[in-house]
Amino acid sequence: MAPPRKLHIKSYGCQMNVYDAQRMVDVLAPEGFVETASVDDADLVILNTCHIREKASEKVFSELGRLRLARDEASRDGRRMQIVVAGCVAQAEGDEIVRRQPAVDVVVGPQSYHHLPRLLAQAAQTGRALETEFPIADKFGFLPQPQPEAIRARGISAFVTVQEGCDKFCTFCVVPYTRGAEVSRPVAAILADVERLADHGVRELTLIGQNVNAYHGDGPDGRPWTLGRLLQRLAAVPGIVRLRYSTSHPNDVDDDLIAAHRDLDALMPFVHLPVQSGSDRILAAMNRKHTAADYRRVIDRFRAVRPEIAFSSDFIVGFPGETDADFEATLALVTQIGYAGAYSFKYSPRPGTPAAEMPEMVPAAVMDERLERLQQVIDAQQSAFNRAAIGRTVDVLFERAGRKPGQIVGRTAYLQPAHVFPPAGMAPDSLVGQILPVRVDSLERYSLLGELAATPPRHARPLAATGA
């Protein structure tokens, strides 16, 4: 029997890329590949790229330069290393990658990685393989199921893609061009995946999609199901104790999703709901198709049915034409909502997007100053939210042993890491997969520290009360 070939994947960007990287491993496992943490002994290296941030492609080319040296070293040792560029940079700039970096064997877009075995064989024969077309048939029907040992090795939490692509065409965003139009998987296919994951130890699911709450997959009744209805069904799968979803668009929050948050204890009271700006003028320029007031009303709908719910968001500062008044409107919105955390970025033009051609680019120094001010407010809110847990008892789903001997690590409903030393005689590994009450004693940066409690947890105070 031939020895296994070693595969190293370096993944950038979003949760979808994390999921895609795992599925690439599943695709290549029948071909005899096993994962390795090191590039140096890899027979195959895959860069699973992201195109969202500025200079994404240049970072890829820089990494490819380093990989070319590793490939040369492998060749001197008598080994052949193949190099693959996958993901959204591959989709957007495949021809440029082929032109600039001859060391690359395969360039494959995010809708075609189920063809990796064929593409690798083609590259071995002809020297190069490129596939970045959007296929007629979606890839999910062709992906092999992960092996039980792979599921267990990935832990008790898992991502499941239910929707892919986006039809919103925000003027700053490349996703519609790199991931394509919105496609939703059938309910039956998702349910089969989830039941298999649960059978092999998964306890927490995060349903993912570029615009996940636009989900409209075919249901067993022959009608399209909403995300809320899908969540209701998945909450009934034995073994699944927590459900999450990401990333959402405010315009696609419907009655079914609100009802799911009202009715399902398994659906965590923590929602990532990007808004990008608090200025109606900038929101219109971004083609977001909602106002700041619309966004606040969506937040209010969630809080009306789940008072303990918390939110995170995304913000862009320095969008073309953003004035001081526009930025102050963003600060005002952040203060009004009160977030458990948020991600803030300086605007970076993405080639091929409408915003990249807009006039009135904001000076870099102004963007830097605005980003710092916004991040200070966000950090203060996150600190206040975390401090509010001190002295309280919260539910923690334990995931793995901690870095310190005898320590166990899990996460709260709000994704806060929680570090606990179980009582003497209780093995930390025995707690993995269990939800147990933890009394929070203190904080360490963004983590909660505490001890197992005998009393059941209380609901956290609604986040609106902790806004900075």
UniProtKB/Swiss-Prot annotation:
Instruction: Name any one GO molecular function.
Output: metal ion binding
A Gene Ontology cellular component where this protein is annotated is: cytosol
| Positions annotated to bind [4Fe-4S] cluster 2 | 166, 170, 173
UniProt KW Plastid keyword: no
Q: Tell me where in this chain the MTTase N-terminal domain is found.
A: 5-125
Tell me its cofactors. Answer: [4Fe-4S] cluster
Q: What is its EC number?
A: 2.8.4.3
User: Which keywords appear in this protein's UniProt record, sorted alphabetically?
Assistant: 4Fe-4S, Cytoplasm, Iron, Iron-sulfur, Metal-binding, S-adenosyl-L-methionine, Transferase, tRNA processing
> Which NCBIfam families would you find in this protein's record?
miaB-methiolase, MiaB/RimO family radical SAM methylthiotransferase
Designated gene of the protein: miaB
What does it do? Answer: Catalyzes the methylthiolation of N6-(dimethylallyl)adenosine (i(6)A), leading to the formation of 2-methylthio-N6-(dimethylallyl)adenosine (ms(2)i(6)A) at position 37 in tRNAs that read codons beginning with uridine.
Start and end residues of each Radical SAM core domain: 152-384
PANTHER family, alphabetized: CDK5 REGULATORY SUBUNIT-ASSOCIATED PROTEIN 1 (PTHR43020), MITOCHONDRIAL TRNA METHYLTHIOTRANSFERASE CDK5RAP1 (PTHR43020:SF2)
Note describing how the cofactor binds: Binds 2 [4Fe-4S] clusters. One cluster is coordinated with 3 cysteines and an exchangeable S-adenosyl-L-methionine.
Q: Which CDD domains match?
A: Radical_SAM
Positions of the TRAM domain: 387-454
The record's similarity note reads: Belongs to the methylthiotransferase family. MiaB subfamily.
- Protein name per its UniProtKB record: tRNA-2-methylthio-N(6)-dimethylallyladenosine synthase
On subunit structure and binding partners, the annotation says:
Monomer.
